[in-house]
């Protein structure tokens, strides 16, 4: 779960830049927060038509938590996990074609922590998130997958599933 200050800007980034789809929303007005679940894979209507569960059959989901009115508080911020004291600091998204993914990110005018051509590791890139906290999106290619993207928070290697 990632807490976000501005749900609209966060959803725009993860959907428009990272290419995720909003899979489900859970609103809790009495508690003052909403949950947004994003991921890759078929839309609910496509999945249902093919007889699969559209949420549980995803390779991974990203949960965004938005507390009401935080976007209107100029002094409100979350710790990003990359500054001291360090903690959870990035999200890993594996792609089949890193060059194509980086070209897409260039077209979307993302900010980079590490471009594919920077440094010694040529099989990984870091995109800065749109959040003021600058959470990273880690984009490696060494994770085999058949889907367009694979979201795996732990960045553990996974075997491609046979279809």
Model feature map: region roles:
Residues 1, 23-26, 37-39, 82, ...:
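Vicinal oxygen chelate
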Residues 5-22, 104-107:
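Amphipathic alpha-helical segments
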Residues 28-50, 54-59:
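C-terminal "cap" of GNAT-fold acetyltransferases
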Residues 43-44, 67-72:
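Active-site/binding-pocket entry motifs
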Residues 56-58, 82-87:
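Short, low-complexity disordered segments enriched in Ser/Pro/Gly and basic
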Residues 71-75, 145:
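Short acidic/His/Gly/Ser-rich catalytic and metal-binding motifs that mark active-site loops
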Residues 74-83:
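Short, polar loop/linker segments at the starts of domains and inter-domain junctions
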């Amino acid at each position: 779960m990632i807490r976000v200050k501005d749900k609209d800007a966060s959803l725009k980034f993860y959907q428009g830049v990272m290419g995720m789809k909003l899979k489900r929303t859970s609103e809790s007005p009495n508690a003052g927060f909403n949950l947004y679940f994003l991921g890759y894979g078929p839309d609910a209507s496509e999945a249902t038509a093919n007889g699969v569960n559209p949420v549980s059959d995803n390779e991974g989901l990203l949960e965004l938590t938005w507390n009401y009115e935080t976007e209107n508080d100029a002094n409100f911020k979350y710790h990003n996990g990359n500054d001291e004291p360090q903690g959870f600091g990035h999200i890993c998204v594996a792609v089949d074609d890193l060059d194509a993914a980086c070209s897409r990110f260039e077209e979307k005018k993302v900010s980079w922590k590490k471009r594919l051509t920077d440094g010694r590791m040529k099989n990984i890139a870091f995109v800065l998130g749109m959040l003021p906290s600058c959470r990273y999106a880690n984009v490696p290619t060494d994770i085999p997958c058949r889907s367009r993207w694979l979201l795996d928070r732990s960045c553990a290697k996974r075997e491609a599933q046979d279809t």
